[in-house]
Amino acid sequence: MDQKQIEEIVRSVMASMGQTAPAPSEAKCTTTTCAAPVTSESCALDLGSAEAKAWIGVENPHRADVLTELRRSTVARVCTGRAGPRPRTQALLRFLADHSRSKDTVLKEVPEEWGKAQGLLEVRSEISDKNLYLTRPDMGRRLCAEAVEALKAQCVANPDVQVVISDGLSTDAITVNYEEILPPLMAGLKQAGLKVGTPFFVRYGRVKIEDQIGEILGAKVVILLVGERPGLGQSESLSCYAVYSPRMATTVEADRTCISNIHQGGTPPVEAAAVIVDLAKRMLEQKASGINMTR
């Protein structure tokens, strides 16, 4: 699927919702602007700000304009300079700040009020706390007994598509991107004439938990939106794992189709929603997912 096809899908889905599709972006990375190289170091600078990300630490550069253009083109750690054989203080502090931000989003919990505010049914895996989630991934692949009963009682049975949201390894990925991806995704699926299941939130879920969910609800396609393991400076990235007719005993990782890097600096959530709708339709047509799908 090329960029032109993706843009057409986005326009189609947004038009069905009565909204205007966003203008296509030329680049997939978030760029920062910096009028001129800045080499001074300040303790007052917010290390998470755009100014800090645009900071250039190379002193007395031969071609300052080249460094400025390079810094604008990427969010990678370039043009940070050195202090002898060591990183400059500003560069090291930003590295530590980004590491702390990534660690925080793994360890913190999705507030209970968040699910209620979104009107989502909340269930959990066999995990009871974050520490157990990180040390026992096998337990995150299965629903607890109470969750199984809740799904049977409160969710639509035998849907064409079942959408599931889970915190995974990034709380921020869910809370930041939810409002931009779920409404257009649900609207697009319904507009396509598909029977859509009741969306719900799974706390402490791993990817394979979608197999049990699909088996319990009799879903033809299960779409799991889950927080990715964060990288340095990027703690809001979401992934979509879609699978056709999942079964706990037989479904393997090659049966899943993954769309990763969903966030404002990667694949925009609205665009991802349109691509997921098209993917679900093709899965139902081909009755396959993962490596079994034809291009």
Swiss-Prot record:
Tell me, what's a Pfam family for it?
EutC
User: One biological process GO term for this chain?
Assistant: amino acid metabolic process
Name the top EC class. lyase
Q: Which InterPro entries match?
A: EutC (IPR009246), EutC_C (IPR042251)
Query: What pathway annotation does it carry?
Result: Amine and polyamine degradation; ethanolamine degradation
What does this protein need as cofactor?
A: adenosylcob(III)alamin
What EC number(s) is this enzyme filed under?
4.3.1.7
Query: Keywords assigned by UniProt?
Result: Bacterial microcompartment, Cobalamin, Cobalt, Lyase
Reactions listed under catalytic activity: ethanolamine = acetaldehyde + NH4(+)
Q: Which annotated residues bind adenosylcob(III)alamin?
A: V207, E228, C258
What GO terms fall under cellular component here?
ethanolamine ammonia-lyase complex; ethanolamine degradation polyhedral organelle
Cross-referenced Gene3D superfamilies: 6.10.140.690, 6.10.250.2060, Ethanolamine ammonia-lyase light chain (EutC)
Please indicate if the UniProt record lists Lyase as a keyword.
Answer: yes
Q: Which domain of life is it from?
A: Bacteria
A GO molecular function annotation here is:
ethanolamine ammonia-lyase activity
Query: Where is this protein chiefly located?
Result: other
Specify whether Lyase is a keyword of the entry.
Answer: yes
- Subcellular location(s) of the protein: Bacterial microcompartment
The record describes how the cofactor is bound as: Binds between the large and small subunits.
Q: How does it assemble?
A: The basic unit is a heterodimer which dimerizes to form tetramers. The heterotetramers trimerize; 6 large subunits form a core ring with 6 small subunits projecting outwards.
Q: Which family does it belong to?
A: Belongs to the EutC family.
Function description: Catalyzes the deamination of various vicinal amino-alcohols to oxo compounds. Allows this organism to utilize ethanolamine as the sole source of nitrogen and carbon in the presence of external vitamin B12.
PANTHER family per the UniProt record, alphabetical:
ETHANOLAMINE AMMONIA-LYASE LIGHT CHAIN, ETHANOLAMINE AMMONIA-LYASE SMALL SUBUNIT
Q: From the Swiss-Prot or TrEMBL record, give the protein name.
A: Ethanolamine ammonia-lyase small subunit
